[in-house]
Design a protein with these regions (language model features):
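Conserved residues in the N-terminal Rossmann fold of short-chain dehydrogenase/reductase
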Residues: 68, 91-93, 136-139, 159
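Glycine-rich adenosyl-binding loop in Rossmann-like folds that engage adenosine-containing cofactors
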Residues: 96-140, 144
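A short helix-to-beta-strand connector/capping loop
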Residues: 83-89, 132-133, 153-154
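SAM cofactor-binding core of SAM-dependent methyltransferases
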Residues: 22-109, 119, 189-196
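Membrane-proximal basic amphipathic "stem/tether" segments
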Residues: 1-35
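Conserved acidic-Pro-Pro-aromatic motif
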Residues: 38-42, 51-56, 60-66, 73, ...
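General small-molecule cofactor/ligand-binding pocket signal
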Residues: 17, 89-91, 214
């Protein structure tokens, strides 16, 4: 069958070959950080510091400001960041489009926790993401932290990984969004959380505020 397909495709001057899987999303991010000469990172949804630790292992030496809403994870971050003089853990809070008091749904795997209720589509694929607890949390706009962000060395990357609330974080950063040279965020093709905004709506919003897909 491969020979038949190759003969057919070969009529157009192309050939299909098996190649090793070379694409590494994180290495692509590192290359982008270097390309944009990123000196500081605002890390929204730090969880247990997985993202930052990978950055540090890949040689990033700039300032990092991390936000994490979960109680245990926030305490853990404060502990491990003490050895990193350029890594600051901000007060325990969630980030959103308005200042409020909310309930965060805590998943069994921690990293799937969200201000939005998780849908069966998610838990069917990852049973460890089921809600096991809730916590009361202050939700604040990223705008509230403008003075700290303005002090960061430019260029600044904004990283958002908050399980369905990415659009709300962007809206809550509307007054300082021009401070960021680039934005790295997780988007979803399908609804995994109630009321979450999907990839196309987020991309349209980013284009509206003069960012483009890289």
């Amino acid at each position: 069958m491969k020979e038949i397909i190759n003969k057919f495709v070969g009529l157009s001057g192309y050939q299909i070959k098996r190649v090793k899987y070379l694409y590494d999303p994180f290495q692509n991010l590192i290359k982008s950080i270097n390309y944009f000469n990123v000196k500081s990172i605002v890390d929204v949804g730090a969880n247990k510091g997985q993202f930052v630790n990978k950055l540090l292992k890949n040689g990033f030496k700039g300032n990092i400001l991390s936000f994490e809403p979960l109680f245990d994870e926030h305490n853990y971050l404060k502990k491990i960041s003490k050895k990193k003089n350029k890594w600051t853990i901000e007060e325990r809070c969630a980030l959103g489009k308005k200042n409020s008091n909310e309930k965060i749904y805590v998943s069994g795997n921690s990293e799937s926790s969200s201000l939005l209720k998780i849908l069966p589509k998610h838990t069917d694929i990852r049973p460890d993401s089921k809600i096991v607890d809730t916590q009361e949390i202050n939700v604040k706009k990223l705008n509230n932290f403008k003075n700290k962000i303005y002090k960061l060395e430019k260029n600044i990357l904004l990283k958002i990984d908050c399980q369905g609330s990415e659009m709300d974080v962007l809206i809550g950063a509307n007054k300082i969004i021009k401070s960021f040279s680039c934005i790295f965020l997780e988007v979803s093709l399908v609804n995994l959380y109630q009321k979450q905004k999907l990839w196309l709506e987020i991309i349209k919003y980013l284009k509206k505020i003069n960012f483009e897909v890289w």
